[in-house]
Regions:
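Bacterial Sec-exported substrate-binding components of ABC uptake systems
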Residues: 2-94, 200-226, 289-295, 318, ...
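Short helix-initiation/N-cap motifs at beta->coil->alpha
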Residues: 79, 135-143, 263-270
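A short, structured surface patch at a secondary-structure boundary
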Residues: 90, 96-145
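Basic- and aromatic-lined ligand-binding clefts that recognize polyanionic substrates
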Residues: 90-102, 201-255, 259
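Extracytoplasmic ligand-binding site segments that recognize negatively charged/polar headgroups
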Residues: 117-122, 161-163, 178-190, 225-247, ...
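Proline-aspartate-enriched helix->loop->beta-strand connector
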Residues: 150-155, 173, 279-282
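Extracytoplasmic substrate-binding proteins
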Residues: 163-233, 329-345
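Structured C-terminal subdomain patch of bacterial secreted/periplasmic proteins
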Residues: 280-345
């Protein structure tokens, strides 16, 4: 059975994003920004990555034509083809998205590369993750540590580790998606194909999509606009459609402010323009140490304090590790739970 499946929503997003778009939202240093042609009225937009526009479409074409349980099997992926002689048992994951993916499929990885500055296993995965060893960070892999674990499969992305692929593939069969982020569903199916757990992945995605649709139904026809604000050490972002959280909100049918209805990762604003985050509900995340960001500066601005959502208690902090860093179906389901708690009365 072929695993070459993708969601209709992702197809539309990839087609609509005809220009070079932004990189994924899981880190602070993956993206550049283009300004609004010198206009003070138009926010900068996070951009980058030559394959961003087509990433979901391309990733959906990757995978295997092997039947369930069939090994050896050959996987096509972002870096070419990889043969797996037998079902993997010792898996190393190079980002949180792959971590979420394998754990949701019942696999306890032997190694994990966390985000910069945070070596901990994400709390929402800890119960089912086993005891994976640290193998560096997403941007600074420890190849010796990876080799020492004697993996039989390495899962990662071209965006994070293309320059390490040749070395990694000499350690173990290595399968790369193009990038993390709004392609999380396609990445999940690719990882599942390598693990011979495609049926499980499809079942998990179907359940997620039904859960998202039910949330939208239960909120009712008069849906509030949702603004997504994230504070990073060197920027403030309003996350848009081509992001992990953007796909979740779209799946639930939740509308966005006009400045976030773009086929990019995010708009970028200064603390002085924090009122551009205005919406019926504002959800804020922080990447890393809040003191290293301009969150306090932005939220002490009278423009922030005077927003209706802020005055009426509809501006809320959300966990960065699920809403922005999770990049997998387990995190996506937890985001839906959080949204339900706030939006369904």
């Amino acid at each position: 059975m072929s695993i070459r499946r993708r969601s209709t929503a992702a197809v539309g997003l990839a087609v609509a994003a005809a220009l070079s778009l932004s990189a994924c939202g899981s880190g602070a240093s993956d993206d550049s920004a283009k300004s609004g042609a010198g206009s003070d009225k138009k926010a900068a937009v996070a951009t980058g990555g030559k394959d961003f526009a087509d990433a979901a479409k391309k990733t959906a074409a990757y995978g295997t034509d092997a039947e369930a349980g069939q090994f050896p099997r050959t996987l096509t992926h972002a870096m070419g083809t990889t043969e797996l002689k037998s079902a993997p048992k010792r898996v190393v994951v190079l980002d949180v998205g792959e971590f979420d993916n394998v754990v949701s499929l019942g696999v306890k990885p032997v190694g994990y590369a966390p985000s910069e500055g945070d070596a901990a296993i994400p709390s929402y995965l800890k119960k089912d993750a086993g005891n994976p060893k640290n193998v560096g960070t997403i941007n600074n892999l420890n190849l010796e540590a990876i080799a020492g674990l004697k993996p039989d499969l390495i899962l990662g992305s071209q965006l994070r580790a293309a320059d390490k692929y040749d070395q990694l593939s000499k350690i173990a069969p290595t399968v790369f998606s193009i990038r993390p982020g709004f392609t999380w569903k396609e990445n999940y199916l690719l990882n599942a194909a390598a693990l011979d757990r495609t049926a499980k992945a499809k079942s998990e995605l179907d359940a997620y999509e039904k859960k998202a649709a039910k949330l939208g139904e239960d909120i009712g026809p008069d849906k509030p606009t949702i603004s997504m604000v994230r504070y990073l050490p060197d920027r403030i972002r309003l996350y848009a459609k081509a992001s992990f959280i953007g796909t979740i909100l779209e799946d639930a049918g939740l509308p966005r402010p006009k400045n976030q209805q773009i086929n990019d990762l995010a708009a970028e604003i200064s603390p002085e323009k924090i009122d551009e985050a205005d919406a019926d509900w504002i959800f804020t995340g922080v990447y890393g140490d809040p003191k290293a960001t301009k969150r306090d500066t932005a939220q002490s601005n009278p423009l922030w304090k005077n927003l209706k959502a802020v005055k009426e208690g509809r501006a809320k902090d959300v966990p960065d590790e699920t809403w922005y860093l999770g990049l997998g179906v387990t995190a996506a389901n937890l985001v839906l739970d959080d949204l339900r708690a706030d939006l369904v009365k």
